Amino acid sequence: MAEVSEAAASPAADSEEAADMHGDILGLLLSFVLVLFFIGLSFIVVKSGRRLFGDSCPEVARKVVHIGVSNWFFIYCFVFETDIWPIVGLGFFTLANALMNVTGLLSVLMGQDSRTRNWGLVQYPVSIIIVILLKHFGLGDMAAVGCAVLAMGYGDGLASLVGKAVKSKRLGSWTKKTYAGSITMVCVTMIVVILMKVFIGGVSFTGTLVLKAALVAVFAALVEAFTPFGLDNMSVPIAIFLVMRFV
């Protein structure tokens, strides 16, 4: 009887593995489409947006990629079936970003001088790989991954744009972050945390959740402001992911 049970279970297991593989392949394809779409959109901004954005056009183009690519989280959450293939895909994008950055191609696509280096866009997928690994080893859940990725994408991206568009003082001589940018970071991160906890984590919307989200948002803004050497694309997502254990 045991042999019959094992034989019956084998096709079911094979079918489940095949379904997982199909989800992972679709996830990889959608990941490439997403990245190429936002790179193409940023290129359009570079070529056609100077009249609208002026000298800020390269920065806007860079943030189009920064914000847009963060939506990859939804592919990871709803399409991918395992953690290994998202990490493989992110590893590929890390190497591709690094190569384009070293050659200056990435800067040209962003409308900048070819000698400019955008290591932040290289750090971005590395930080997501680390966050996924931390989740894989039980140090957080899917909602925490969403908070980390989307707060970095939307929070940091919009904070940078608002910080440059709105004249306000710097937080201090030790940072380039402004009050306007940091307030934007706090507001956007707070919204992201609430949405992720409610819709991904299944938590009820309460005053306690709002308070915890506000504390996480302030913490994220402080990490961003105090991170040296432009490494906030690494520090912010990882810090948010880890602190979400207490939310």
Label each region the model flagged:
Residues 6:
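Luminal/periplasmic acceptor-recognition loop/helix of membrane-associated glycosyltransferases
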Residues 3, 11-37, 43-87, 95-246:
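Interhelical loop and helix-boundary elements at the membrane-water interface
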